[in-house]
Amino acid sequence: MSLPATFDLTPEDAQLLLAANTHLGARNVQVHQEPYVFNTRPDGVNVINVGKTWEKIVLAARIIAAIPNPEDVCAISSRTYGQRAVLKFSAHTGATPIAGRFTPGSFTNYITRSFKEPRLIIVTDPRSDFQAIKEASYVNIPVIALTDLDSPSEYVDVAIPCNNRGKHSIGLVWYLLAREVLRLRGALVDRTQPWAIMPDLYFYRNPEEVEQQAVEEASATGATEEATEEATEETTEATEWAEDNTENATW
């Protein structure tokens, strides 16, 4: 698929894709994923062509931007590493997020509270999100999926080849997809200027690490405050001592 020059993969985005290990695929390859294989390493790991990944990101973004109501797009991830990315993607593009367990019947059983009628769904992993893909096929909802080289492609209309097991790879693909959607909608006018949002915002963060970091920051803040108080007390004592000496000398 040839893209206009405006949509070409920039060296900066290519470096991001490589740094996030988006190009590291599975050892096994499905038949429909063979065109996305760039090379095979000596250890058996297949390398994904990041150029193909970028082309599919742009194609998916054009499909998403073509839907008038952003809420008709449903972003889904039952995989833990993709839940934060799905929530951020939905916050920036206006899509409807389903982060966590997908309730069976959400697309087919109108009696359930979680019933939805989206015009398009985006899933993080065709395996873990198979229930959503299966129900979408029943009601003719197009499916965009982040697929590894060994991922099943049944009922998937647009497959974005990438490493859908790594937290950095998943977050970066969702980030690039959100950025391209905003550019196509006109929210980001100039393509030469970088987006103010950083890719780190889409990465999964371990709650225990977040709590530990907060405790460390609080400890550092407390230590700084204690040092400031001690310095203030020492300064006050020195001032009082100097005043006492001055009074004694005057007397």
Curated annotation (Swiss-Prot):
GO terms for cellular component: cytosolic small ribosomal subunit. GO terms for molecular function: structural constituent of ribosome. Residues 214-251 are annotated as: Disordered. Required for the assembly and/or stability of the 40S ribosomal subunit. Required for the processing of the 20S rRNA-precursor to mature 18S rRNA in a late step of the maturation of 40S ribosomal subunits. Residues 226-251 have a biased composition (Acidic residues). Its main location: cytoplasm. Component of the small ribosomal subunit. Mature ribosomes consist of a small (40S) and a large (60S) subunit. The 40S subunit contains about 33 different proteins and 1 molecule of RNA (18S). The 60S subunit contains about 49 different proteins and 3 molecules of RNA (25S, 5.8S and 5S). Interacts with RPS21. This is Small ribosomal subunit protein uS2B. Belongs to the universal ribosomal protein uS2 family. The modification N-acetylserine is found at S2. It comes from Vanderwaltozyma polyspora (strain ATCC 22028 / DSM 70294 / BCRC 21397 / CBS 2163 / NBRC 10782 / NRRL Y-8283 / UCD 57-17) (Kluyveromyces polysporus). Keywords: Acetylation, Cytoplasm, Ribonucleoprotein, Ribosomal protein. It is found in: Cytoplasm. The keyword RNA-binding does not apply. GO terms for biological process: ribosomal small subunit assembly; translation. The keyword Metal-binding does not apply. InterPro entries: Ribosomal_uS2, Ribosomal_uS2_CS, Ribosomal_uS2_euk, Ribosomal_uS2_euk/arc, Ribosomal_uS2_flav_dom_sf. The gene is RPS0B. Residues 214-225 have a biased composition (Low complexity). Pfam families: Ribosomal_S2.
